[in-house]
Curated annotation (Swiss-Prot):
The keyword Plastid does not apply. Keywords: DNA-binding, Metal-binding, Nucleus, Transcription, Transcription regulation, Zinc. Transcription factor that may coregulate the expression of the gene cluster that mediates the biosynthesis of the lipopeptide antibiotics leucinostatins that show extensive biological activities, including antimalarial, antiviral, antibacterial, antifungal, and antitumor activities, as well as phytotoxic. It is found in: Nucleus. Residues 12-35 bind DNA. It comes from the Eukaryota. The keyword Zinc applies. GO terms for molecular function: DNA binding; DNA-binding transcription factor activity, RNA polymerase II-specific; zinc ion binding. This is Transcription regulator lscL. Transmembrane segments: none annotated. It comes from Purpureocillium lilacinum. GO terms for cellular component: nucleus.
Amino acid sequence: MHLDWTLVLASRIRKVKCDEKKPCCQKCIDTGRTCDGYESPFRVVTSRSIINGARASGIPGAASRPVRPALTEISPADIDLLNRYFSTKTMFDVKLGCDEEAREVLEASLTDPTVRHAVSSLRSLREHLETSGDVSASAAQQSPSYGYDYGVQQYCMALGGLASNLSSPGSNALKSALLCCQIFISIEQVRGNYGTMAQHIIQGLGIMHEYRARPTLDDANNLVPAHHAQLPLLDAFVIKLFAAPCKFAEPSATADKEGGKAVSMCAISRHEQTVGSRNLRTIVPDMRTELTRISTSTLDFLVKVSSVDSAGNALRLLPEKTALLESLKSWLMDLELVHADIKSPGTEPLAVSFLRLFHQILKIILVEALNSSSNLQAELRTENDRLQGIGSIIDERVQSQRKNSSALDLIDNRLKCPA
């Protein structure tokens, strides 16, 4: 597998010319890039440029705001805070259950600068989200913010450090990569860039499989033991992120909290919540409940895979894997029947698109489990492309939602304050 985080970094500081409609052409959305003529939100910025920009924009206290020192010890409060920052769902009082993952990341950040930069980025971007209500690139460019710029700078530094480490991957570099990948997924979720989030998921799951974070079977059904160094289990982390309750899809859900504009992993627009939402609210929770049940069973299955110590034990788990894949297949068929009247993925409720994303992630995780056969890569390319496609569709929907929201706000302001 090609560990190309260098490409991910380069795509954020390079502009691309294309003949499609800017700035939402499919070519650029799929690669996480920005059309030529549009400023990349992932530009590399220095501390001096951030300070100068803050002074020029008149942001109170931004120029003199001190950079918080790195942690020297880990407290329960630190763990709880990072666990909360892993997902925007926690802004709506949802419990995530990633305390151990948070502890592992924070412990690594004490000695690993790359992980430390990633944590710092997530913290800054999440704090900016909670204070401003939006961390979209357009919002940041219209209202420059030290927190946003600093978060982007730290993200670029983490990506650069990771690409350098993976030029000769050893156990420490692999652990760093998987921990950073967890944080990168959370960063892109905070920023609402679901196509790029999908890229990080694909990349991280690929590293897990290639370097055997869990035991597997070869073509001859011989056991291939797990990597000698215990690697972070990114698959379990991602499942927990998506399986956490989504208040937007629950019958008792209300509109976004205190008028905030953040889009969660299961967000539904205000229009979708008020127009024709009665049927959606009775259908989506049921579909989500079943998918969550499958994800819980998948987590249990992965625990069993990790403890496999013989080929015989591994082979006895294969029927369970097959049953889970069949459950996913049946779930998708049911979803298509429920939404048979929807002609295009771009017109279905966002909540449904996020369920599709979760379904595809579970499928990839299960396809990779206990499988290192020679034909696996061809199958994974197809499944990864599907995941990337779903992420890109969600990107388009979220960006369109933001534009519509901005336009409505502008009209509303003009009506209130006529020229």
